[in-house]
Amino acid sequence: MTSLFFYQISDKQKRWNWYWKLALAIIVLVVIIYSFIDNFSGFNVSGFRNFSRNFIRLFTPDTARDYFLGSYLLQTIFYVVSGSILGFVIALWFSYLTAFKIQPLYIALPTRLFTIFLRSFPVLVFAFLFNNLFNKQLTATLTITWFSWLWSTKYITAFFENSALKQFFNQSSRYIHKFKAFWNTVVISQAERLWLFLLYSLEANFRWTTVLSIAGITGIGELIATPLGGTVQLNLVLIPMLTLIGFLLFLEASVFLLTKFVLQKQSQAGDYFLQAKTLQKRKWKKVMIYILALVLAAFTLANLVQLDYTVKAPGFVADFFKQFFQTKTAFLISEDANINPLLMLLKLTTQAISLITLVFVLALLFGFLASKLFSTITSISLKLLLLVIRVIPSVLLFRLFDPIIFRPETTIIFVLAIHSAASYGQLITINFDNANEGVINNMQNHGFSRFYILWNYLIPTTKPQLLNTLSDSFDNAIRDLVVFGIFGGSIIGGRINNFFERAQYSELGTITLPLMVYLMVFEVILMAVRLNKLKVWQRHLW
């Protein structure tokens, strides 16, 4: 019976027979085609006139208006830095608790399931919740802290579990306090990589401010999101947008320089004079890191000191969650796709499949074209283009292109695909550039084309990273589509926004809880796969 499904390649490894792989490929292809048919509409030819008018309006800014750009930008810097630092610190502690290779199962599993549960809440829910409890600056700080804590925990945990832990176990076995051993052997030894992660998360959180402004979060993103809301005023967008883009480009350049000259590890030099020079460089690097830490700490403390911690409605949280978990069963048996949350989830899944298919194809293309296989001019030009795409607010792109596409969900998918592909393309380029140059040069010397090298060497070599990218992009796609539901990007996201605005928290819970279960099941399956608990993935499909 086993031979019907698998063939043996070694004593411990099997592979699926080719016809089952073919059947699986056909099923996946059919699902993708159905998802595209279900979610894509044609172009609205008459909408091109509105598109050109909107484009002209965008580049005809209202220069007489006082935008208070400095005040809004400084406000954003305060709460993003503060929230990112607080979230990162909490994430370090939770990553220590949730790492299966560090903690016993009875500690790691419940803690990880707890973070998965909290992460399953759409970010809109807690943004709206904080808005009802606190003033704008505290709401913004808490939202960034919440977001950074939960998502940083996920990635830092994976990083810790993939680290060399021999020294940690040696120290912890010598009756040294376990956390102290963890700090000395894992955190300190990998400080450069953790700093890099913090800087990249800071940069990502600044980009997220425009999206979070949809949910009422204050800051410079508010100056962009508000004119793009109900009554679109494109002439008010350009000046704050250019300010934000300029700041993001400055931030990207700063992160690049810090990565290149401060946080990048250097190999040990053999020559005495080179060693002395290396030690001198390390001293300067330490000074720069201390200065960076002081600047970030200063912004964090300054923000925390000036915050107003007054709670507007102390009883609101208890009342909210009491209603939130009182689900309406009539919704679950309705045949209307605009009412039944299960049908909404089915629709959301097809949207996510369409989105990640586009993201994966575009990111692979971007990563390939920006890699070392192409000329330096081509690579740098594309990297700069991807950088510009990443810093342009996705809300603006949606408003610009929406008139020329019949359905808003199609526009959202295209906009998110381009934005996400620009980010993931950068990661894929790094993975491709880290491949064995000797093998690539040898293949080029034998006359193999770039596409042949991509298909037969780069993709197979980086398959684990590509699969991780694919799985992460599906999870992120679901959450992004929910956020953009306010603009018609998804039914379920639109309903969450409507029910919160009307204070219909029971209906909100009825719509949100199935989505949370859906996300939790996906994360638990993904966790099991990554920890090799589901051996069929590793042994039969890999």
From Swiss-Prot:
InterPro entries found in the cross-reference section: MetI-like, MetI-like_sf
Range of residues in the leader sequence: none
GO cellular component terms, semicolon-separated: plasma membrane
Transmembrane annotation, as ranges: 23-43, 77-97, 114-134, 140-160, 212-232, 236-256, 287-307, 350-370, 386-406, 412-432, 481-501, 509-529
Main localization category: membrane
SUPFAM superfamilies assigned: MetI-like
ABC transmembrane type-1 domain boundaries: 349-526
Keywords assigned: Cell membrane, Membrane, Repeat, Transmembrane, Transmembrane helix, Transport
Membrane topology: Multi-pass membrane protein
Compartments in which it is found: Cell membrane
Gene Ontology biological process terms, A to Z: transmembrane transport
Domains as described in the record: Composed of two homologous domains.
Biological role: Probably part of a high-affinity transport system.
Family statement drawn from the similarity comment of this UniProt entry: Belongs to the binding-protein-dependent transport system permease family.
Protein name, UniProt field: ABC transport system permease protein p69
Gene this chain is encoded by: p69
